[in-house]
C-alpha cells in the first residue's frame, strides 16, 4: 500500500514537473524552428547582427571577469568572516536581483551619466559610459554579479575551515592556503556562478537600453527590429540568439560536469 501511494505521488510530481518543462521548452522550440536555415544564415551574414551578437558575448564576458576579480575575494570574506554589517552587505549584493532593471538603468545613469561625478571623472580619462561599451559592461556587472558572489560564497562555506588552519599551522601563508586549498575546493561553485552570471548578462535589456541604446547588443537589436518591422523581421534574430546561447550554455555545462567527475 505504501509503495502504491509513493508511486502515485511520484506520478503526480512527474506530471506537474512535465507541465513546467513544456511551459519553458515549447516557446523555445517553436521559435527555434520558425525560421529556415537559409533565412538564419542570411541573417547571420548581416554585419549589424554579427556585431551585436559579438558585442553581447564580449561585454558579458568582461563583466564576468571583473566580477571574478572583485567578487571572489568578497565571497571569501563573507564565508569566512563575521563582522558588523555583514547581513547588510549580503542584502546589498542581492538587491540587483529584485530591483526592476529599468530602475537599475536609471540608478546607474545617476552615477555614471555624463554630468554625474563618476561620469565626469572617467570622462577626463577618455572613458564614457552613456552610449558606449563600458556602460554596457557596467550594466551587466550590476544586474548579474549576485549570481557569482552568492555561488562563490556557498562554495567557500562548503570548504571545512579546519583545512586552512592545518595548513597555517604547518607554515603556509594565508595566500598559499587560499590558492592551494580553499579556491580549488570551491572552484566548481565559482565556475557555476560565472556561467550563470555570463548567461544572465547576455539576456539583459531593460537597464542596457537606458544606459547604452547604441552600440546595440543583441536584445536591443531584437527589440528595435520588432518595433520597427514586426515579428517576421525580428524572428530570425531571436532564433539565432536562442540557438547560440543554448549551444554555448550546454557546452559550458558539459565542461563543468567533466571537471566535477575528474575531481570526484
Which residue stretches match the model-derived regions?
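Extracytoplasmic catalytic/substrate-binding loops of multi-pass membrane glycan-assembly enzymes
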Residues: 216-217
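Membrane-water interface segments at the C-terminal ends of transmembrane alpha-helices
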Residues: 2-38, 47-157, 181, 185-205, ...
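Structured catalytic cores of enzymes that bind and process phosphorylated ligands/cofactors
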Residues: 99, 171-172
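Glycine/proline-centered hinge or cleavage motifs at structural transition points of membrane proteins
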Residues: 170-171, 184
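Hydrophobic positions on the alpha-helical face of helix-turn-helix-like DNA-binding modules
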Residues: 166-167, 177, 181, 222
Amino acid at each position: 500500500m505504501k509503495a502504491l501511494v509513493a508511486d502515485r505521488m511520484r506520478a503526480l510530481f512527474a506530471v506537474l514537473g512535465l507541465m513546467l518543462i513544456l511551459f519553458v521548452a515549447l516557446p523555445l522550440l517553436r521559435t527555434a524552428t520558425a525560421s529556415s536555415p537559409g533565412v538564419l544564415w542570411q541573417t547571420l551574414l548581416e554585419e549589424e547582427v554579427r556585431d551585436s551578437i559579438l558585442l553581447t558575448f564580449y561585454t558579458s564576458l568582461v563583466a564576468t571577469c571583473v566580477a571574478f576579480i572583485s567578487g571572489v575575494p568578497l565571497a571569501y570574506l563573507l564565508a569566512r568572516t563575521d563582522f558588523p554589517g555583514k547581513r547588510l552587505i549580503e542584502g546589498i549584493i542581492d538587491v540587483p536581483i529584485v530591483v526592476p532593471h529599468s530602475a537599475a538603468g536609471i540608478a546607474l545613469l545617476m552615477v555614471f551619466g555624463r554630468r554625474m561625478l563618476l561620469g565626469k571623472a572617467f570622462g577626463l580619462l577618455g572613458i564614457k559610459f552613456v552610449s558606449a561599451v563600458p556602460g554596457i559592461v557596467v550594466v551587466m556587472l550590476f544586474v548579474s554579479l549576485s549570481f557569482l558572489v552568492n555561488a562563490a560564497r556557498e562554495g567557500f562555506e562548503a570548504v571545512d575551515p579546519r583545512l586552512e588552519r592545518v595548513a597555517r599551522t604547518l607554515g603556509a601563508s594565508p595566500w598559499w592556503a587560499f590558492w592551494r586549498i580553499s579556491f580549488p575546493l570551491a572552484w566548481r561553485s565559482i565556475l557555476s556562478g560565472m556561467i550563470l552570471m555570463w548567461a544572465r548578462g547576455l539576456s539583459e535589456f531593460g537597464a542596457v537600453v537606458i544606459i547604452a541604446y547604441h552600440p546595440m547588443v543583441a536584445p536591443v537589436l531584437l527589440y528595435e527590429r520588432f518595433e520597427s518591422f514586426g515579428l517576421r523581421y525580428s524572428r530570425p534574430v531571436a532564433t539565432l540568439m536562442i540557438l547560440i546561447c543554448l549551444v554555448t550554455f550546454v557546452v559550458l555545462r558539459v565542461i563543468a560536469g567533466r571537471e566535477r567527475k575528474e575531481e570526484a
